[in-house]
């Protein structure tokens, strides 16, 4: 948790330094931390005086598909984050430290949306040349389940809603139509 808090402080310092007027936090307990950073780095009510003339953005830039590659590590990380977040959410926690970062539903949404999209998009190819497929996703999901079970112990794994989370993640990833929001599907697990 200490490393996660350090990362929160670092992120808020970057945001205030970039000229943001405010920020969001994943949990109400983080409000005092973010407030302290912004009070120190932004002593005025806003940053309207801080122009970013070093950044030139055109309308066409907003529609451009980003360049880059999909890495095996990135795909595996998306599977891990999605699984861990869903398991935590099903356990009643909406803000979770994962990989030393405080994560919430938005992070899991991005991760699972990328997985779903990469499986279906013609450019869904890993840097090593492999296609991102449902079978590859399922292989990575099973690997992550084994890794988590070994790391935390079988009893903790079983008690942590990981099996239900894995089944749900598989269901929404395999769905023909993109599911609007992962927690909507997760609510069915609670009833």
Report the location of each language-model feature.
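Expand to "…catalyze enediolate/carbanion chemistry for C-C bond making/breaking, isomerization
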Residues: 1-191
């Amino acid at each position: 948790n200490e490393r996660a808090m350090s990362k929160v402080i670092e992120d808020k310092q970057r945001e205030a330094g970039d000229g943001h007027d405010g920020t969001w936090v994943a949990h109400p307990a983080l409000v005092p931390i973010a407030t302290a950073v912004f009070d120190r780095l932004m002593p005025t009510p806003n940053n309207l005086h801080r122009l970013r003339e070093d950044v030139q953005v055109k309308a066409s830039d907003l529609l451009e598909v980003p360049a880059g590659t999909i890495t095996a590590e990135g795909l595996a990380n998306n599977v891990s984050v999605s699984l861990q977040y869903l398991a935590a959410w099903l356990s009643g926690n909406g803000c979770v430290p994962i990989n030393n970062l405080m994560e919430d539903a938005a992070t899991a949404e991005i991760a699972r949306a990328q997985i779903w999209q990469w499986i279906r998009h013609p450019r869904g190819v890993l840097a090593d040349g492999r296609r991102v497929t449902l079978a590859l996703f399922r292989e990575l999901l099973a690997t992550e389940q084994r890794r988590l079970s070994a790391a935390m112990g079988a009893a903790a794994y079983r008690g942590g809603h990981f099996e239900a989370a894995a089944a749900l993640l598989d269901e929404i990833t395999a769905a023909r139509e993109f599911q609007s929001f992962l927690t909507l599907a997760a609510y069915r697990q609670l009833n």
